[in-house]
């Protein structure tokens, strides 16, 4: 018996909210407000907040926040464990499938793009290639590794700065382990996100307000015990090349703990570095497509609580969710 077109039709696409924006723009407050109002599950899309070692220094949601709404993928990896876009995407897809209303929250643009637009199908280079790339970096330095890469994979080398050791090591390990450069892998076809309709709530506050928030937040982190948190990790003598050691404020506090700079200087440098990073984040988000224009809502102020959740945005979200049901 032939099924009717209605019986054969695919199920309606499910709603997915993305709360994105630069560091300290108020993403966590907005995501929590949305989760409480609409019954959502918050899924972390911030690379550094994946690490269990970094609760204070990354401003992870507090235990009270986590009790107020379901939170997923926060503090799920040790610093010594690998966290990258491919690993995160696999975990995030599983969390999306389990959530009634998934709410992605984070500022790691590469993670969000990998989920929505797909990710290059790069195989695992393997431990030997990874170790050799690290050895080359430690022995010769980033400039020499960049020159080595330029001679063998110029398409990738032209996109990397000689002063960026982490990305250079990643490019080297991929070339060594797969025989193919990162640029070639990134040019390969990729599958995007199927079965979901995406709404983007993009926070883009004025830079002076953001800079003020960054400074206040770092001082609050120090008062809450960020220095002790970093000292506990430093006591383990971790590999200096670990990506998790690049979390905002960590390099500066490590330098202070080593006696190289004062705590005031560490705070000043951390605030400046974070502010510079937020400028790059804001630029990236303005030029990347994570949702259709009609489902993209840009919020020009820094959110601190749900009282700034405008009724027009609420109505848009309700309409968006209902269309998916």
From Swiss-Prot:
The keyword DNA-binding does not apply. One of its GO terms (molecular function) is tRNA dimethylallyltransferase activity. Keywords: ATP-binding, Magnesium, Nucleotide-binding, Transferase, tRNA processing. InterPro entries: Dimethylallyltransferase, IPT, P-loop_NTPase. It holds the Pfam family IPPT. ATP binds at residues 21-28. The record marks 108, 130 as: Interaction with substrate tRNA. It catalyses: adenosine(37) in tRNA + dimethylallyl diphosphate = N(6)-dimethylallyladenosine(37) in tRNA + diphosphate. It is an enzyme of class 2 (transferase). Its EC number is 2.5.1.75. GO terms for biological process: tRNA modification. Its cofactor is Mg(2+). Residues 166-170 are annotated as: Interaction with substrate tRNA. Substrate binds at residues 23-28. Monomer. PANTHER family: TRNA DIMETHYLALLYLTRANSFERASE. Belongs to the IPP transferase family. Catalyzes the transfer of a dimethylallyl group onto the adenine at position 37 in tRNAs that read codons beginning with uridine, leading to the formation of N6-(dimethylallyl)adenosine (i(6)A). This is tRNA dimethylallyltransferase.
